[in-house]
Amino acid sequence: MISVQPSLTPQPGGRVRRVANAFALAFVSLITVASFAGSAIRPGDRVAIIGNTLADQLRVHGYFETFLLQLPAEPRVSVRNLGWAGDMLSARDRPTNFQTEESVLIAHQTDVIIACFGLGESFAGTAGLPAFRTALKAFVDSHRGRKYNGKTEVRLILVSPIAYENLGTLTPEHERRNRELADYTAAMEQVATGQELPFVNLFQPTREIMADASAPKLTTNGIHLNAYGYWAVGRMLTAGVATIPPPWALRIDASALRATGDGVTIMQVEPVAGGVRFSVQEQRPPTLAPPLKGPIHAALQPLRDTLAVANLAPGEYLLTIDGQPVLTATDDRWAAGIAVDTSPRHREAETFRQAVNDKNQQFVYGWKALNQVHIVGERKSSPSGQALPAEVIAFKRLADEQDEALLRRPVPLALTHTWQLTPATRPSSRP
């Protein structure tokens, strides 16, 4: 049996507890034994993410932040992502006159910092490990006692690099790189344990799922995650810092007209037109769908909302929700269980993620203005250069307004929808 450790979460008294479950369970139940109040991220936290390209691209894809905003506890968290591609602990260069990180942390009234480092540093190999430990301890010390929210000491969460993916001839040294990354992950864990900090180990679970050569790739070049990779790692990272409710699981017996559900309440199961119809009342938001068609890693399949319908007569069946077609499959596939994350409610969840991404884009325009020639260069005194400060302020205001809108945006629950499976009249689609 293979086990994974997507996180170390703090326990009362500052001790660090390793959380591990069977790999076959993917990551859906890795920390469900802990209450949200005991998690590294707490309701209402104002979170800042800093670090390398992994952190930077969390902002671009938005899965991690959306997963956090979907957590059931209120109030919701507020996130600002200060990740910068290529950042290392000892190399965090910024343009001339760029605002300090401290000023942004104070402006956000930051309660907790999620720090992603270790990838760039790992290229120094074994010889670089002592310097990495020293730099990481210095980083922790630099935030020790700081009260960016004006009230309480900021909390730190350390996040390891992901594994190095084998892409054949594109990554000829993946075995050596993974040995180095394992060493740097272990060093980061040692520092976290010594400093009594939460630690999220992304290296081990990503290395395990990358071993499935038949599954879709998680990265574009062995190092940088693609959209699917950020969906998967976003879920892992969320499981490392908070308690994630399991996804929807609907189970129907079309013959006995019985049903059970996780995340939903199923009512009024009845036969209809050679199939079955039932009402579904949602108790939790739908889970974000992976951003690709076709199969995903078998170990990640339990992260998806699913419907299983047993004892259908042989044939193909169309699932509709409130009359809208969702997907078609054969009776044996329905009996085995199928992911149902293309429903109207799942499309609403994707729209919410896009709103998160838009907020983050407005923040970047205000925080990391791209046209330096108008800020400190030769066009600083031009009309466009003189107008830029007001534009930057406007972008910051837009980001704050959109953030507040996201925090207030209701998550419609206890909604009841009519689900129905009836014999299909078209070829089955393969979700």
Give each language-model segment a name.
Residues 3, 7, 29, 428-429:
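Serine residues within intrinsically disordered or low-complexity segments
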Residues 41-43, 62-80, 87-430:
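Alpha-helical cap/lid subdomain in secreted, periplasmic
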Residues 17-22, 430:
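Intrinsically disordered, low-complexity, compositionally biased regions/tails
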Residues 36-39:
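Boundary at the C-terminal end of the N-terminal hydrophobic targeting segment
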